[in-house]
Regions:
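Intrinsic disorder/low-complexity segments
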Residues: 6-9, 41, 96, 155
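Hydrophobic transmembrane signal anchors and adjacent membrane-proximal interface regions, especially
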Residues: 7, 20-21, 44, 89, ...
Length: 191
């Protein structure tokens, strides 16, 4: 009768059955270790890049939402007053916190009292106010680059421009030009 290769082998010493041998041979063990090592070398860089990919995706989502909100606010300004300067234009809802000042080009500039006939985006606080009004639930923002304080850092760039750096990975940013309404997303972590 033939025994299967998978069945237990029995050693005989001088005709006596002494022990049953089970397990891996040394060669099998070495092969498994080598295969696991190769998999680790190939897979490790991909798994390490997952965190960066998540940060890039977060900035892309925030940037796309911000860009859409700028476009909608501009459309509302065009419909309400022909796109010129407007003070306290109700963007959505009916609360004072949902109002924005629109500049002479018809784009969001700030949210500050008192009345201004020609509102301008001209400091980091204006950048923060535009950000906070345009998002219904905005990612946290401040003028600090401390990741424990806020997700984004607002930086004013003269004239009338903002750069929102992503604090967990500062190479990523969202750029807003209030004179043209352009929103640019820098989602290259190597830039």
């Amino acid at each position: 009768m033939l025994k299967s290769a998978r069945m237990e082998k029995q050693k005989t010493i001088m005709g006596k059955h002494t022990m049953k041998v089970k397990g891996f041979t040394l060669i099998e063990l070495v092969v498994v270790i080598v295969v696991l090592g190769i998999l680790a070398v190939v897979a490790a860089p991909r798994f390490l890049g997952v965190t960066t990919d998540a940060h890039v995706a977060s900035v892309q989502r925030s940037g796309a939402s911000f860009k859409t909100a700028i476009s909608l606010a501009h459309s509302k300004a065009m419909a309400m007053n022909g796109g010129g300067p407007a003070d306290n234009l109700q963007i959505y809802g009916d609360a004072p916190d949902d109002q924005l000042d629109i500049n002479r080009w018809g784009f969001p500039a700030q949210q500050w009292p008192p009345f201004e006939s020609d509102p301008r985006l001209d400091n980091s606080d204006d950048c923060i106010s535009v950000w906070n009004v345009l998002f219904v639930e905005p990612p946290s923002i401040s003028t600090s680059n401390d990741v424990n304080q806020s997700e984004y850092q607002a930086n004013y760039i003269n004239p009338g421009q903002c750069r929102y750096n992503y604090n967990p990975l500062p190479e990523l940013s969202i750029f807003y030009n209030s004179q043209t309404g352009d929103v640019t997303i820098d989602d290259d972590p190597d830039s």
